């Protein structure tokens, strides 16, 4: 089974399974295909978190493929520029090392059965030959073209004559295909060192950022112990911080104390309880989720049923919390 938001990405994952790949191979193939077909949502320039269940050992491992901020971007620099409290959403300082490529390679190397060249074949083919753009993707693509691509270095590679592709139009991305081929041939080193790394650092610096080639060359994924809780006797697993999966576990712990089964799934009463539970969970995640090397969250306390009971008492049956903390 392969499930994504895009049929062509599903087809990429299924193709890999038919070639003898396993879930790890198919997941990376589907992610790469989504990079091609839904570039407004995901891509090799982002991060990668993954949970993998090994049936032979009955163990779950968590891959943290997120990238760090540039080494030179310290608090003093942000304070000097008046940015210590908040960064504008499209500020070049928000650009971190892209961890997805290493995450893909590491997941396939540790748990996959095929080579990266085989795994990236469907996505490379889509990028080279083109694909019909889906309506919702076209909508968000157009928004991005107006806000960012028009002035972004290399933005023309994601537009057609300066505009976003329309729904149903065939779009090709030869530049992304070349990147995939280099990773297929040279592994993650081809992305984090050499021409690609130089281009990434140069573009970020030209935009006013401080990402350097050394930041990319020093990047590594890490394998972590997953975190979990139980919801009505079913155990749920997530990646630990700095992943955001903690919010889902906190929300389920809070929600477990309500008899939502007695409420219609679409009723205002049930939706209210679900929303308020997650608002409290997101508030905790905003406060506690950070780089665990510098600020480790008290996970045992946060995931305890006693803590969930404390948070649950903040949920009112007939009104919303205006600003949960």
Which residue ranges define each predicted feature?
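Noncatalytic scaffold domains of N-terminal-nucleophile
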Residues: 1-11, 15, 21-186, 191-193, ...
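Flexible, polar/acidic helix-loop-strand segments at domain edges
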Residues: 246
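Conserved catalytic core of Hanks-type protein kinase domains
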Residues: 254
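Internal maturation/activation junctions in enzymes
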Residues: 257-325
